[in-house]
């Protein structure tokens, strides 16, 4: 399956929007979900979790949470209501 090219800037924008639109107590889990959803693209294009977090404007400590989601993408498939 061919993975669509999404720029690192676009990924950062998507992450920022997803984070800001989340309920306060679900923001971290939404970072994990983002990593799961876009993990294959992030890995294929060798994008850095640190750079995505930096470009998104989120606290740099969230890099760890994004990295967890990216690693989980190898094992987890999102339910339809969480994917495009």
Give the role of each language-model region.
Residues 62-83:
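Short, solvent-exposed alpha-helical "recognition" segments
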Residues 45:
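Flexible coil/turn residues that form the inter-helical turn or adjacent wing/linker of helix-turn-helix
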Residues 1-9:
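General nucleic-acid-binding
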């Amino acid at each position: 399956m061919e993975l669509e090219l999404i720029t690192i800037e676009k990924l950062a924008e998507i992450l920022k929007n997803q984070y800001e639109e989340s309920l306060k107590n679900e923001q971290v889990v939404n970072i994990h979900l983002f990593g799961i959803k876009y993990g294959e693209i992030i890995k294929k294009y060798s994008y850095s979790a640190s750079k995505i977090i930096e470009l998104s404007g989120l606290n740099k400590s969230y890099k760890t949470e994004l990295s967890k989601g990216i690693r989980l993408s190898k094992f987890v498939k999102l339910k339809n209501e969480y994917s495009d």
